[in-house]
């Protein structure tokens, strides 16, 4: 399917052309509306703080894709991509449009997803809430003028009605909340939730369909570029250090979360950043902290009467967020695109303490680890003992992938081949024992290893293949103790290390079985100890 198809616009145009619909308001104009409507409050730093109500994160069980004949055979149906028939969708869609038509004011934004013009999606966003429209303005790519915005004919339209509550019995939803993607009607329909991240991730899901169908890779990763134009991609789940490691003063940021990779190189899908704000401090994350200023939206942070912000207070949620335009960060590439990657870093926080701090992957190993998407999370048990739990998220972004995972893995494998990309697996987790016994790998050492991988110093260094995982481990890395490079050497009891390692290998193998026979060739060559 080509990106160059358009939203059916008859009813949508009626909403846009209403006398009380506000088109392409500036940040200041939206601030005035937000404050007048009591949607948010001004903070000491100049940002607007809003509350999203009972939904402080995404609602994955309420996300649907419409089963339209031209598209249904391409979708990887299941718990993530839940089907909704077209008749049910259209009934609800028209109810929402009629509901919005009764609203006194609406807010319209026109812009883009995709900073490479050859692969960009033209967007229109229709919002019930002014702060949601500011979120769209911050997160998507902004046109350079009102004239340009007015001439955008949308390939996809977000219709957002957070105060419209669905009736599951009548509307075919699971709850009052719904996020529905229709590839035929080119619409993302959102209702029953004020969590603005549904708009961002809805468009990412759309791009994860449209781009790969044109053999363009879409990726849930951060990306940066060095002074010589060398590009690095960082894949990793929450808590692996993706944001920290890709924010490098020596390199410019391309983007922090969503990217495409086409024949021209890597490009950011977004025009903004949606950063976690819990425990944010100027000392630890100055780039993000300095972006909390006029024009930025804070979600669910706690403010005091004097407008000061307590970033450590999780009263409403651990998932507090800041949404700001990418140009609020100083060290960025403009526009947000660069050449083909030289280096890919897969980040994992292994709380079992057995995966090497860094290893160089073959193409088959890269595809295996991309499909696995492993990290570990710490879950409290009934007796209060904290044990590591393995966590696998296919392609490091399972909730946002409409197509079969193998489509993304095959695209990545081909691109690694074509552009001779070096791929490294970096463990930012534990060494010398599992969580509670071992210690966290020093961030200083991790930075040193990543820096040398990206600079090319590790490309032709000497490697040994470890007996346990079959991974290629560097024999020596400048400024990093050799004792930590091979994890077995950091454990006092080698038998305990092997038992823990083989347990993790079995978990990987069990997880990989879900992909079936179509990935046997990857498992045979890329799995541990192959």
Swiss-Prot record:
Its cofactor is Mn(2+). It catalyses: oxaloacetate + ATP = phosphoenolpyruvate + ADP + CO2. It holds the Pfam family PEPCK_ATP. Binds 1 Mn(2+) ion per subunit. Keywords: ATP-binding, Cytoplasm, Decarboxylase, Gluconeogenesis, Lyase, Manganese, Metal-binding, Nucleotide-binding. GO terms for biological process: gluconeogenesis. It is an enzyme of class 4 (lyase). PROSITE patterns: PEPCK_ATP. ATP binds at residues 201, 220, 236-244, 285, 321, 440-441, 446. It is found in: Cytoplasm. Belongs to the phosphoenolpyruvate carboxykinase (ATP) family. This is Phosphoenolpyruvate carboxykinase (ATP). It comes from Staphylococcus epidermidis (strain ATCC 12228 / FDA PCI 1200). The lineage of its organism: Bacteria, Bacillati, Bacillota, Bacilli, Bacillales.
């Amino acid at each position: 399917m080509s990106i160059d198809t358009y939203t059916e616009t008859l009813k949508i145009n009626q909403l846009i052309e209403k006398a009380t619909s506000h088109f392409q308001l500036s940040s200041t104009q939206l601030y005035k509306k937000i404050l007048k409507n009591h949607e948010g409050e001004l903070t000491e730093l100049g940002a607007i703080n809003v509350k999203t109500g009972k939904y402080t994160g995404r609602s994955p069980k309420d996300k649907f894709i419409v089963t339209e004949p031209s598209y249904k055979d391409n979708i990887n149906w299941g718990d993530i991509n839940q089907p909704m028939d077209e008749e049910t969708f259209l009934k609800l869609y028209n109810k929402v449009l009629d509901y919005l038509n009764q609203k006194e004011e609406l807010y319209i934004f026109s812009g883009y997803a995709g900073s490479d013009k050859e692969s960009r999606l033209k967007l229109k966003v229709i919002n019930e809430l002014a702060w949601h429209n500011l979120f769209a303005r911050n997160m998507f790519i902004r046109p350079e003028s009102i004239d340009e915005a007015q001439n955008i004919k949308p390939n996809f339209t977000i219709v957002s009605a957070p105060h419209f509550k669905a009736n599951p019995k009548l509307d075919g939803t699971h709850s009052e909340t719904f996020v529905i993607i229709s590839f035929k009607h080119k619409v993302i329909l959102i209702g029953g939730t004020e969590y603005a991240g549904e708009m961002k991730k809805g468009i990412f899901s759309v791009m994860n369909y449209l781009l790969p169908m044109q053999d363009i890779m879409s990726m849930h990763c951060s990306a940066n570029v060095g002074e010589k134009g060398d590009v690095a991609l960082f894949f990793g789940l929450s808590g692996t250090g993706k944001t920290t490691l890709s924010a490098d003063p020596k390199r410019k940021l391309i983007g922090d979360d969503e990217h495409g990779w086409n024949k021209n190189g890597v490009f950011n899908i977004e025009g903004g950043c949606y950063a976690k704000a819990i425990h944010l401090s100027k000392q630890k994350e100055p780039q993000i902290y300095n972006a909390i200023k006029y024009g930025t939206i804070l979600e669910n942070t706690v403010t005091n009467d004097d407008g000061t912000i307590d970033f450590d207070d999780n009263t409403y949620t651990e998932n507090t967020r800041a949404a700001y335009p990418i140009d609020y960060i100083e060290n960025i590439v403009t526009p947000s695109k660069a050449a083909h990657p030289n280096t890919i870093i897969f980040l994992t926080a292994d709380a079992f303490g057995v995966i090497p701090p860094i290893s160089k992957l073959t193409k088959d190993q890269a595809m295996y680890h991309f499909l696995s998407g492993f990290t570990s999370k710490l879950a409290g048990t009934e007796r209060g003992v904290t044990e590591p739990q393995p966590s696998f998220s296919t392609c490091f972004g399972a909730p946002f992938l409409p197509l079969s995972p193998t489509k993304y893995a095959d695209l990545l494998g081909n691109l690694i081949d074509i552009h001779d990309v070096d791929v490294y697996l970096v463990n930012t987790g534990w060494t010398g024992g599992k969580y509670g016994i071992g210690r966290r790998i020093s961030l200083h050492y991790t930075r040193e290893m990543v820096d040398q991988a990206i600079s090319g110093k590790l490309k032709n260094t000497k490697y040994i293949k470890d007996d346990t995982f079959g991974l290629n481990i560097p024999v020596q890395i400048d400024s990093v103790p050799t004792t930590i490079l091979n994890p077995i050497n950091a454990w006092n009891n080698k038998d305990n290390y092997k038992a823990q390692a083989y347990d993790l290998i079995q978990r990987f193998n069990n997880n990989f079985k879900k992909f079936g026979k179509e990935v046997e060739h990857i498992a045979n060559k890329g799995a541990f100890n192959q």
